[in-house]
């Protein structure tokens, strides 16, 4: 266990992951039409290009804690289509990635949904490696993290996954281990594949006046 080393306890994508670590907090974003925000001179952090929500119906392996892979992939594809972008436009994936058995399946679902090879997968990260799993608040917090990254041109590291899960190893070049500047970052995909086989994915774009 990691009781004596709490900073190493949350281990998404790791071969030694032993389940999610509860966290807490909140994340709030104000959504506003672009015309309204411009008219009042608001600071615009990012644009929401599109999103998609669905449920796997507890079928094809889906359950209270496991996602239906077909529905996960349909959710990702739906968000990309609604955003009007191509898979190659995505520069960073902020995944659900919880340090459970589902992590390798999630990474493969991203690859399959985007119809890319392992080498072509965008950068991928887990905010839960930094703060744990805030349950109902996780998606909001991770949306804030996503917006900050696309606005400021960086990707935060995923901690504690130096020992990548064997099924994730082929995606090693995409896993962000250390925080780094990514000045060319313009589109980020944020997803939550939560309890009850419920899925959500949103596409954020860097705002350019």
Predicted regions and their residues:
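Glycine-rich, phosphate-binding/catalytic loops in enzymes
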Residues: 46-47, 109-111, 206
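Condensing-enzyme catalytic core mediating Claisen C-C bond formation in acyl metabolism
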Residues: 5-85, 91-92, 209
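Stable alpha-helical structural segments in soluble proteins, enriched in small hydrophobic residues
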Residues: 75-83, 109, 113, 146-149
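Conserved beta-strand-centric core segments of catalytic alpha/beta enzyme folds
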Residues: 1-36, 138-209
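Beta-strand segments within the central parallel beta-sheet cores of soluble alpha/beta enzyme folds
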Residues: 43-51, 88-95, 121-129, 157-165, ...
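Acidic-glycine-rich active-site phosphate/pyrophosphate-binding loop
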Residues: 1-8, 106-124, 173-178
